[in-house]
Regions:
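Sec-dependent bacterial lipoprotein signal peptides
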Residues: 1-25
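Bacterial Sec signal peptide processing site at the extreme N-terminus
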Residues: 19-39
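Extracellular beta-sheet/turn segments enriched in Thr/Pro/Gly and aliphatic residues
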Residues: 26-31, 98-99, 103-130
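Asparagine-centered strand-capping/turn motif at beta-strand->loop junctions
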Residues: 42-46
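Short beta-strand/loop motifs in extracellular/secreted proteins, especially
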Residues: 48-52, 85-87
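Short amphipathic beta-strand segments in non-cytosolic proteins
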Residues: 53-60
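Exposed aromatic-hydrophobic patches
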Residues: 72-79
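A short, solvent-exposed beta-strand micro-motif common in secreted/extracellular proteins
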Residues: 82-95
């Protein structure tokens, strides 16, 4: 019995471990290889600096701050916002109590959103490019 157990430990166990090794190297992710991100570019023509958020229903994701007369680019993963890709952008002027929210948009992986904030925020423009 000891010889049989010794052969198991010496030959069969290492063979089983070698056979199981490739299974540990298989990628088990359900996320596709290509990134599920959108690029959001915000140009600020308003005299106030803006803190920009992506909004989905009641959830806000802070993207960053855009200074006056500058443009910032942000990357947002789609699974951070919603499975449908629906979101709104919110501009919160620094030092003001008023905020401005874009109309709802639907974005898909790889798309680029360009938001140009004007002096009168109601005249701001939003463009989606593939």
């Amino acid at each position: 019995m000891a010889a049989h157990m010794s052969r198991f430990v010496r030959v069969i166990l290492p063979t089983l471990m070698l056979l199981a090794l490739p299974a540990g190297c298989i990628k088990h992710s359900v996320i596709p290889d290509e990134p599920d991100v959108v690029t959001i570019s915000v140009s600020n023509s308003n005299p106030l600096d803006m803190t920009v958020y992506a909004v989905n229903q009641s959830m806000r994701i802070r993207l960053g701050t855009v200074s006056t007369a500058s443009t910032q680019r942000f990357t947002l993963s789609l699974h951070q916002i919603s499975p449908t890709g629906e979101l709104q952008l919110l501009a919160d002027p620094v030092g003001s109590r008023r905020t401005f929210t874009s109309e709802p948009i639907h974005v898909f992986a790889g798309q680029a959103v360009e938001w140009v904030l004007q002096v009168d925020l109601r005249q701001s423009t939003l463009t989606i490019r593939s």
